[in-house]
């Protein structure tokens, strides 16, 4: 049975930097830098310009990952795309990324499957686990795994929405997962969900139980109320469950491998809130040098946080071959996951 290892990483963030002060100055939100930093650790985030979507961000990260993997794009056997902000209701962003990469064009055209994963902040680990299983089955050799988001198109940029909107930014990260006979790669993964909390963090922009699923007036023009248009969150419940589930699932992947936190060289936590990660770090007594974070620069890019962190760590030299890496995420659903790998 082949193993699945990360052969290449890539990332991309939009050029526009939106600071905490910009939220107040440009959008009139009643907030300030100190208020946001104290609660989240976030100092700035990136916003994509008008006309740029999730697959547009993803193609840059994907091309970087493919190049760093040392393969041709036509060597890919599958795309697994994690996002909560696809271009449209359907089709998914995976086929748009396939289109933008030109995989179906020219004499080397290859019509590989493109799968979208909708598991929000846990999406990348759900996607990575899916790709790992496909490789271990022998069905594929190279899988492009992407996490990308364009949050800025759906944020309530008013004082009413400041608690949620100040958290999120746009960005994309990607890895190429490849088959190998070497003793390396993804050693174990674990996923979980608790649907009892499905409404605790949600964006209910439509309700498919209603006819039509978006209310319309007598002229057929859609009418969407703010509580439906924008994400709603019970922050205290999210914080409590995130801490418990992230710690729990981390031990669930380490224990069967006879590993402890002392064996891990780098912890890559989803970047939802710096205070969540600091609480976990303190609880588990993880040294600062074993942690990576970028939430202060990018905010929460949901499915993109972990692959961006991996790519930046490789780029900076902090993540090197042979290191043991633990990845952990928690998100809406509630969903969560963890994976441990030999880099």
Language-model-detected regions and their locations in the chain:
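Phosphate/pyrophosphate-binding loops at sites that engage ATP/ADP/AMP, CoA/4′-phosphopantetheine
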Residues: 61-77, 248-265, 313, 317-318
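Short beta-strand segments
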Residues: 7, 82, 118, 143-149, ...
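Conserved catalytic cysteine-centered active-site region
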Residues: 30-56, 84-143, 148, 282-310
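Catalytic phosphate/nucleotide-handling subdomain of diverse soluble enzymes
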Residues: 308-328, 334-343
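Short glycine-rich or small-residue beta-strand-to-loop segments that form or flank ligand, phosphate
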Residues: 77-84, 267-268, 294
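Condensing-enzyme catalytic core mediating Claisen C-C bond formation in acyl metabolism
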Residues: 1-50, 161-240, 244, 248, ...
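Active-site pocket-lining segment
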Residues: 242-247, 261, 265-283
């Amino acid at each position: 049975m082949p193993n699945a290892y990360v052969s290449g990483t890539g990332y991309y963030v939009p050029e526009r930097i939106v600071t905490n002060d910009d939220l107040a100055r440009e959008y009139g939100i009643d907030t300030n830098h100190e208020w946001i930093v104290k609660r989240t650790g976030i100092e700035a985030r990136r916003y994509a310009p008008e006309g740029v979507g999730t697959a547009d961000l993803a193609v840059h990260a994907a091309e970087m990952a493919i190049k760093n993997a040392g393969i041709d794009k036509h060597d890919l056997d599958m795309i697994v795309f994690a996002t909560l902000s696809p271009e449209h209701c359907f089709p998914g962003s995976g086929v748009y990324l396939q289109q933008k990469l030109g995989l179906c064009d020219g004499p080397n055209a290859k019509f590989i499957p493109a799968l979208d994963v909708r598991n929000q902040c846990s999406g990348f680990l759900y996607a990575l686990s899916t790709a790992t299983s496909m490789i271990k089955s022998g069905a594929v050799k190279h899988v492009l795994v992407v996490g990308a988001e364009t949050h800025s198109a759906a944020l309530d940029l008013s004082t009413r929405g400041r608690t949620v909107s100040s958290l999120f930014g746009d960005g994309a990260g990607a890895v190429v997962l490849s088959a190998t006979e070497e003793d390396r790669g993804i050693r174990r993964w674990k996923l979980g969900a608790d649907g009892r909390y499905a409404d605790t963090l949600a964006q209910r922009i439509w309700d498919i139980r209603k006819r039509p699923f978006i209310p319309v007036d007598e002229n057929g023009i859609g009418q969407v109320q703010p509580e439906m248009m924008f994400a709603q969150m019970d922050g205290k419940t999210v914080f409590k469950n995130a801490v418990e589930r992230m710690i729990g699932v981390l031990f669930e992947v380490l224990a069967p491998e006879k590993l402890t936190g002392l064996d891990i060289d780098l912890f890559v936590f989803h970047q939802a809130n710096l205070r969540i990660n600091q609480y976990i770090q303190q609880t588990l007594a993880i040294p600062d040098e074993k942690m990576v974070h970028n939430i202060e620069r990018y905010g929460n890019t949901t499915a993109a946080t972990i692959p961006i962190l991996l790519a930046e760590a490789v780029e900076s030299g902090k993540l090197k071959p042979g290191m043991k890496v633990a990845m952990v995420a928690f998100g809406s659903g509630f969903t969560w996951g963890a994976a441990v790998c030999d880099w």
